[in-house]
UniProtKB/Swiss-Prot annotation:
Role noted for this protein: An essential GTPase which binds GTP, GDP and possibly (p)ppGpp with moderate affinity, with high nucleotide exchange rates and a fairly low GTP hydrolysis rate. Plays a role in control of the cell cycle, stress response, ribosome biogenesis and in those bacteria that undergo differentiation, in morphogenesis control.
Residues annotated to bind Mg(2+): S173, T193
Domain annotation OBG-type G: ranges: 160-333
UniProt protein name: GTPase Obg
Organism this protein belongs to: Escherichia coli O1:K1 / APEC
Cofactor: Mg(2+)
Region (Disordered): 127-147
Principal location class: cytoplasm
Length: 390
């Protein structure tokens, strides 16, 4: 299946149903009073994370999602039916962004997690709500409010513990093939890897971690050159980055300059990503003898001002790979993920009462109080009946 990690969609919640103006009319009951019911609330639009999905390709073709409108109120104080909700299923790891405001609405990081992205409109009030001692036959009602409408950007970010960084042909895909069951394409030309891939590294029956391989970075990636900048977002949730350096590039480029390009592109893309723990890993040491490889790695590390530990491996032969993986496993165990507190979603209710409707009633009541003297008429049957009962 084609890997798609971005999609734009339109979500429209249902409008609230309108209130009804109706009066009870039955035999032997000439003045039954108002019996117009309220409308129903509009349906909501929800996002739900599904671990069985791994791409957003479906939303390249289906771009619009609309919830059902609430039904209008009816006579006999019948409340309109609530509009049906719409649920949009997305892969785990999807970030939802409101394109209108640029706000991140939420990150779908767990299977079954739900996020409200468009709230349905509130119901309108029927004329029964406006009955009072001074207004026995109200003809007022309110209409339902419109539902939310948003254009959303969906960004799929792979959930991995370890991210791979490096220039094209640094050996990232060879490394992930060596340590996991993932089989990304490997060849001796740049940009063999065109889409991100994940591999699970199992150290024993109880310990494992997930590593992500993305297309290599080149100079100018932050301005759109190459492929890697598009996929850097997949590294934002990684706990540690493995920076692979080809210790003896076949094209004759300088390993120090190559490493500086990667660091520079990280800083241009995101300071948060650049600040993540990054380990230096020298690959393809099997192409040199042991002493020469150690001397060259030391010289490169000193030129970069690197004072931390670095690793020498050969992904092709497996030399040094196991020790590196165990150190990664230890780091992950000692640095567990801090789960961000999820925003509490509003509870779903069948009937909504709120400040909006209270305000509507208060405004109508104020109008009735102000105009009551002017509206009173000696021929008004209601007025006569009211005085008679007193």
């Amino acid at each position: 299946m084609k890997f798609v990690d971005e999609a734009s969609i339109l979500v429209v919640a249902g409008d609230g149903g309108n209130g009804c103006v109706s009066f009870r009319r039955e035999k032997y009951i000439p003045k039954g009073g108002p019996d117009g019911g309220d409308g129903g609330d509009g349906g909501d639009v929800w996002m739900e994370a599904d671990e069985n999905l791994n791409t957003l390709i479906d939303y390249r073709f289906e771009k619009s999602f609309r919830a059902e409108r609430g039904q209008n109120g009816a006579s006999r104080d019948c409340t309109g039916k609530r509009g049906k909700d719409v649920t949009i299923k997305v892969p785990v790891g999807t970030r939802v962004i409101d394109q209108g405001t640029g706000e991140t609405m939420g990150d779908m990081t767990k299977h079954g997690q739900r996020l409200l992205v468009a709230k349905g409109g509130w119901h309108g009030l029927g004329n029964t709500r406006f009955k009072s001692s001074v207004n026995r036959t109200p003809r007022q009602k309110t209409n339902g409010t419109p539902g939310d409408k948003r254009e959303l950007l969906l960004e799929l970010m792979l959930l991995a513990d370890v991210g791979m960084l490096g220039m094209p042909n640094a050996g990232k895909s060879t490394f992930i093939r060596a340590v996991s069951a993932a089989k990304p394409k490997v060849a001796d030309y740049p940009f063999t890897t065109l889409v991100p891939s994940l591999g699970v590294v199992r150290m024993d029956n109880e310990k494992s971690f997930v590593v992500a391989d993305i297309p290599g970075l080149i100079e100018g990636a932050a301005e759109g050159a190459g492929l890697g900048i598009r996929f850097l977002k997949h590294l934002e949730r990684c706990r540690v980055l493995l920076h692979l350096i080809d210790i003896d590039p076949i094209d004759g480029t300088d390993p120090v300059e190559n490493a500086r390009i990667i660091i520079s592109e990280l800083e241009k893309y995101s300071q948060d990503l650049a600040a993540k723990p990054r380990w230096l890993v020298f690959n393809k040491i099997d192409l040199l003898d042991k002493v020469e490889a150690e001397e060259k790695a030391k010289a490169i590390a000193e030129a970069l001002g690197w004072e931390d530990k670095y690793y020498l491996i050969s992904a092709a032969s497996g030399l040094g790979v196991k020790d590196l993986c165990w150190d990664v496993m230890t780091f992950i165990i000692e640095n567990p993920v801090v789960q961000a507190e999820e925003a509490k979603q509003p509870e779903k209710v069948e009937f909504m009462w709120d400040d909006y409707h209270r305000q509507q009633l208060e405004e109508i009541a104020e109008e009735d109080d102000e105009d009551w003297d002017d509206d009173w008429d000696e021929d008004d049957e209601e007025g006569v009946e009211f005085i008679y009962k007193r």
